[in-house]
């Protein structure tokens, strides 16, 4: 799946706020390297750099366009291309930080267990994942894909990612790994200019697998049909703007010393 750093950063302030909220719950780190997993264009990496300057920091991402943007933004740092599903975390690491990436990997709890085992005592795994598959933005992606004009392009392939496990599932699995764990949900209400802005937002993330599945000639038609549904689902407020409701799941697991 191809990503666009330019599309993603159209809403950089809104996308970075959850990373700030996640990092605020990481109180201190032991000695050792820190990693921004799924670093994207480097917006979250910059937050970590400014907070924990004594820990060598590396950004990891699977997309070359995102890595190019991150290297331009933070030329003093190291950025590596890797698939997180198979990436081997270095032992005695101080921080694994992951803002909005592991929702794309269905077996991510197994990966969390692997990351925790690579933490130094006192090290932290900090994760934020969108938990918005039941929101109109994502329900309508699937409804549009099922329309007769587009259904053939999606036959035999799943564009929709899997739902997240329950919070209890994370707690039960991860506490067995000798960590202190904190799990919570936050619902953000983003004030966007209009319904078209919502479409532009999800074009940078959730819509990517749907658009990638379609032939280029049919993407504009899909976007038009989807945008029409979004305008009906998100009513305009008195000032002309719309509210985008966005639930996110946070997990902070710190290895016991």
Swiss-Prot record:
It is found in: Cytoplasm. Keywords: Cytoplasm, Methyltransferase, S-adenosyl-L-methionine, Transferase. The keyword Protein biosynthesis does not apply. The keyword Methyltransferase applies. It comes from the Bacteria. Gene3D superfamilies: S-adenosyl-L-methionine-dependent methyltransferases (1.10.150.290), Vaccinia Virus protein VP39 (3.40.50.150). Pfam families: Methyltransf_25 (PF13649). Its EC number is 2.1.1.144. Disulfide bonds: none annotated. GO terms for biological process: methylation. GO terms for cellular component: cytoplasm. It is an enzyme of class 2 (transferase). Belongs to the methyltransferase superfamily. Tam family. Catalyzes the S-adenosylmethionine monomethyl esterification of trans-aconitate. This is Trans-aconitate 2-methyltransferase.
């Amino acid at each position: 799946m191809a990503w666009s750093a330019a599309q993603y950063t159209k809403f950089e302030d809104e996308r970075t706020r959850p990373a700030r909220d996640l990092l605020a719950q990481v109180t201190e780190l032991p000695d050792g390297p820190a990693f921004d997993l799924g670093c994207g264009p480097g917006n979250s990496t910059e937050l970590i750099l400014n907070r924990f300057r004594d820990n060598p920091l590396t950004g990891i991402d699977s997309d070359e366009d995102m890595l190019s943007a991150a290297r331009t933004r933070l030329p003093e740092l190291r950025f590596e291309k890797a698939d997180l599903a198979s990436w081997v975390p270095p032992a005695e690491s101080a921080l694994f930080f992951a803002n909005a990436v592991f929702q794309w990997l269905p077996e991510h709890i197994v990966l969390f267990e692997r990351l925790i085992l690579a933490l130094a005592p006192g090290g932290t795994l900090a994760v934020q994942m969108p938990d918005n598959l039941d929101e109109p933005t994502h329900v309508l992606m699937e409804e549009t894909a099922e329309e007769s004009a587009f259904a053939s392009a999606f036959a035999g392939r799943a564009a929709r990612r899997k739902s997240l496990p329950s919070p209890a599932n994370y707690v039960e699995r991860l506490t067995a790994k000798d960590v202190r764990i904190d799990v919570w949900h936050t619902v953000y209400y983003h004030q966007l200019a209009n319904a078209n802005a919502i479409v532009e937002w999800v074009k940078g993330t959730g819509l990517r697998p749907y658009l990638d599945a379609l032939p280029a000639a049919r993407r504009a038609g899909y976007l038009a049909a989807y945008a029409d549904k979004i305008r009906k689902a998100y009513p305009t407020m008195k000032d002309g703007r719309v509210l985008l409701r966005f639930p996110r799941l946070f997990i902070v697991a710190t290895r016991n010393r």
